[in-house]
Amino acid sequence: MSKATNFYLFVLLGVFVALVRTEDEKPPNLTRVPSGLSFSCDGKKPGYYADQQMECQVYHVCTPDNEHAVLLCGPGTIFNQKHLVCDFPSNYACADAAKDADDANAHAFEVKVSPTPVP
């Protein structure tokens, strides 16, 4: 093969790898919370829970009063279960959400009261 042919093959391979990698890293880009979600707070401790069925772009809040709220991360982001924030997919693996939930929610809704200083 000539140097020119090798060069073109190398460029095409690079473009292919870049396209495949970009496609793998894209989260869903929802603009509203979808209907028909199956998540339930029943049996869960109060806290924040990534919805893995929605690729972590949707997350749920289960309150101590047994209320349930559904929230959506912005386009291009997913819910980082470890830090309880919306984050870039390159910073968190949605597949880890279930195992990270208990530790992340251990102190959710906990109110810390500072002692009154004594003069």
Curated annotation (Swiss-Prot):
<feature type="signal peptide">
    <location>
        <begin position="1"/>
        <end position="22"/>
    </location>
</feature>
<protein>
    <recommendedName>
        <fullName>U-scoloptoxin(01)-Cw1a</fullName>
    </recommendedName>
</protein>
<dbReference type="InterPro" id="IPR036508">
    <property type="entry name" value="Chitin-bd_dom_sf"/>
</dbReference>
<keyword id="KW-0732">Signal</keyword>
<dbReference type="GO" id="GO:0008061">
    <property type="term" value="F:chitin binding"/>
</dbReference>
<dbReference type="Pfam" id="PF01607">
    <property type="entry name" value="CBM_14"/>
</dbReference>
<feature type="disulfide bond">
    <location>
        <begin position="73"/>
        <end position="86"/>
    </location>
</feature>
<dbReference type="GO" id="GO:0005576">
    <property type="term" value="C:extracellular region"/>
</dbReference>
<keyword id="KW-1015">Disulfide bond</keyword>
<keyword id="KW-0800">Toxin</keyword>
<keyword id="KW-0147">Chitin-binding</keyword>
<dbReference type="GO" id="GO:0090729">
    <property type="term" value="F:toxin activity"/>
</dbReference>
<dbReference type="InterPro" id="IPR052976">
    <property type="entry name" value="Scoloptoxin-like"/>
</dbReference>
<dbReference type="InterPro" id="IPR002557">
    <property type="entry name" value="Chitin-bd_dom"/>
</dbReference>
<keyword id="KW-0964">Secreted</keyword>
<feature type="domain" description="Chitin-binding type-2">
    <location>
        <begin position="38"/>
        <end position="96"/>
    </location>
</feature>
<comment type="similarity">
    <text>Belongs to the scoloptoxin-01 family.</text>
</comment>
